[in-house]
Amino acid sequence: MGALLGKYKKAVMYFPGGCSIGARPIDLHLKGFEALGAKVTNEKNKYIVEAEELKGANIYLDIASVGATINIMLAAVRAKGTTVIDNAAKEPEIVNVATFLNNMGAKITGAGTSTIKITGVDTLHKCFHEVIPDRIEAGTYILIGALCGNQLKIDNIIPEHIDSLLSKLEEIGTELEIGADYVIVSKSDRYKSTNIKTAVYPGFPTDLQQPFTVLLTQCNGKSKVMETIWENRFMHVPYLIQMGADITVKNQTATIIGPTALTGSEVVATDLRAGAALVAAALIADGKTRITNIEHILRGYENIVEKLTSVGAKIESHEI
């Protein structure tokens, strides 16, 4: 929406969807557009955002939203004057988008900090840009390596982007070799329990909480996972319990007692990261696991079946 608004001064979008992990309002996006001078109307299940002219503004985000930060940047690069986003998200993806826009002629400073300054320009030009590796995909495969890997190498990644994950893995006793653009991971014979609390970057990513929960079922003792970002991020837990895990959930905290052996079962991928967690659980479970609703998994993990089978996993994918 931000790019369309910046270039064409109008954007029309039907109400958004996505994984059912909690409320996904776009009020921060719309608030930012309105601050830049746009008018927002809502009719027949769609948003219409339009402006005769966009003007720079000071915008404070009530929540450090990645999507809102990017959307406002996209619109503000073509606004008249200067825009300042306070309490901006700091994720690596923000920095990468800002670098991309600057390569096209935008004037953005402060990306990666809580305050981003954008000075509008009249035009943008084409450029060459390299998208950063997916840190959540990398983290998921590292967690799978911690569960059942033997010198599993995850290459072409940026380890600094998943520092919080790597620190927790080292804390519980994971065997890691961390290079400039790779991580080599092996399963440990004895893992220690730990507690994690999800947070905005550079804290522990909510998108890795679900697969990390699977690893915690193999740790000795009691572990706790506190989810602070999404209210429905424990949808995978009933299926892990069905497979033999000892997990209780109260409010937004899961308590995991381990280690427990897991057994193959019929499970459902309720969302993208829950699906990834169930794949991880299936790889260490005794027997066969059947996962349905795999479209959630496939849209977020390119060639996941091929990648895992290439390193020894026994996985088959079938269309129903």
Describe each model-derived feature in a short phrase.
Residues 1-320:
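Structural preference for solvent-exposed beta-strand-turn elements
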